């Protein structure tokens, strides 16, 4: 046998075992990255109940397989259309922050698989939403939104725990009502505005009525005062009022450019009350 043939034979005998060993080592090692956990499936014994932490680990190639789960908190949106207590349709969207319970990962893999969240959350989310929304009227969904969110969070967390899922937060991110309810709300707002306007008009009329009463009372008191004054002084008060009125009229006529003042001319045998004195003229005007 030649030297080259011997060399090839030696390399084959050495390299083959080394290759098999290297391949076995490669397939027997696996890494669990940060924020992840591993579950081991054994072809003989099934899913092991021990959860594998972060780092590099070994398994038996072909007989065992590592299933890696992301255990960090992830968001999930759940949308549904449902009816309220007063038979109004409403569209709701929930944002759910969830993660798997680490110790429940073997059971989650056995019962649900890797897509556990897609299998569970939409189903129980719709169930809880329909159940709770049906307990409230459409208007209460708006006025008691925080209370409803708390009830949804509590009920949904309880249901999710049954499947090994931990909910970090649940909140309503979107809420829309049907056109009938929207129209009813608009009509209610218009009715409230009309009621406020009518109330304002009633209050204004009442204020005007009270003002009229006060004004009438004042006029009555003034008339009573004048009557008492007349009873005490007789016609003297009327004469003073006539003089004041005559003075105002004379002043107005004097200031007018279109009026010419002509003194009165009377015969000597005329009535003394009709004499041409200015005072007599003013008194006659006042009368």
From Swiss-Prot:
Biological processes annotated in GO: inner mitochondrial membrane organization; mitochondrion inheritance; mitochondrion organization; mitophagy; negative regulation of proteolysis; protein folding; protein stabilization; substrate localization to autophagosome
Please describe the post-translational modifications of this protein.
The N-terminus is blocked.
Gene3D superfamilies in alphabetical order? Band 7 domain
Q: Which SMART domains match?
A: PHB
Give membrane topology per the record: Peripheral membrane protein
Localization per record: Mitochondrion inner membrane
Assign the protein's first listed, main location to one coarse class: mitochondrion
Which positions does the motif AIM occupy?
109-112
**Positions in coiled-coil regions:** 180-224
Q: Where is this region: Disordered?
A: 264-287
Query: Which residue windows does the record flag with biased composition (Low complexity)?
Result: 272-287
List, alphabetically, the GO terms of the cellular component aspect.
mitochondrial inner membrane; mitochondrial prohibitin complex; mitochondrion
The record's keywords, sorted A to Z, are: Coiled coil, Membrane, Mitochondrion, Mitochondrion inner membrane
**InterPro entries cross-referenced by the UniProt entry:** Band_7, Band_7/SPFH_dom_sf, Prohibitin
Where are the residues of the annotated region Interaction with ATG8?
A: 102-116
Phenotype upon gene inactivation = Impairs mitophagy; decreases interaction between ATG11 and ATG32.
Cited function: Prohibitin probably acts as a holdase/unfoldase for the stabilization of newly synthesized mitochondrial proteins. Involved in mitophagy; may act as an adapter for ATG8 that supports mitophagosome assembly. Negatively regulates the proteolytic processing of ATG32 via the i-AAA protease. Acts as a negative regulator of the m-AAA protease.
Quaternary arrangement and interactors, per the entry?
Answer: The mitochondrial prohibitin complex consists of two subunits (PHB1 and PHB2). The subunits assemble into a membrane-associated ring-shaped supercomplex of approximately 1 mDa. The mitochondrial prohibitin complex interacts with the m-AAA protease, a heterohexamer composed of YTA12/RCA1 and YTA10/AFG3. The mitochondrial prohibitin complex interacts with ATG8 and the interaction may support mitophagosome assembly.
Q: Which family does it belong to?
A: Belongs to the prohibitin family.
Q: What else is known?
A: Present with 9690 molecules/cell in log phase SD medium. PHB1 subunits are targeted to mitochondria by an unconventional non-cleavable targeting sequence present at their N-terminus.
The name of this protein is: Prohibitin-1
């Amino acid at each position: 046998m030649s030297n080259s043939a011997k060399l090839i034979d030696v390399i084959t005998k050495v390299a083959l075992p080394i290759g098999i060993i290297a391949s076995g080592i490669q397939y027997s090692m696996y890494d669990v990255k940060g924020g992840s956990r591993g579950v081991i499936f054994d072809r003989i014994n099934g899913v092991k109940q021990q959860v594998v932490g972060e780092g590099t680990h070994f398994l038996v190639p072909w007989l065992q397989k590592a299933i890696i789960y992301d255990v960090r908190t992830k968001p999930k949106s759940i949308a549904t259309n449902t009816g309220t207590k007063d038979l109004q349709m409403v569209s709701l969207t929930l944002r759910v922050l969830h993660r798997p319970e680490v110790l429940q990962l073997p059971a989650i893999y056995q019962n649900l698989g890797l897509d556990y969240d897609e299998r569970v959350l939409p189903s129980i989310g719709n169930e809880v939403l329909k159940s709770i929304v049906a307990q409230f009227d459409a208007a209460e969904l708006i006025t008691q939104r925080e209370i409803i969110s708390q009830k949804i969070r509590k009920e949904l967390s309880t249901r999710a725990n049954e499947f090994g899922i931990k909910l970090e937060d649940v909140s309503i991110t979107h809420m829309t009502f049907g056109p009938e309810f929207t129209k009813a709300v608009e009509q209610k707002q218009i009715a409230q505005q009309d009621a406020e306007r009518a109330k304002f008009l009633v209050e204004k009329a009442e204020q005007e009525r009270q003002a009229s009463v006060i004004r009438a009372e004042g006029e009555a008191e003034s008339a009573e005062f004048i009557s008492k004054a007349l009873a005490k002084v007789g016609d003297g008060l009327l004469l003073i009022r006539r003089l004041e009125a005559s003075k105002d009229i004379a002043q107005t006529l004097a200031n007018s450019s279109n009026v010419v003042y002509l003194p009165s001319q009377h015969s000597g045998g005329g009535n003394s009350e009709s004499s041409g004195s200015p005072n007599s003229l003013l008194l006659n005007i006042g009368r």
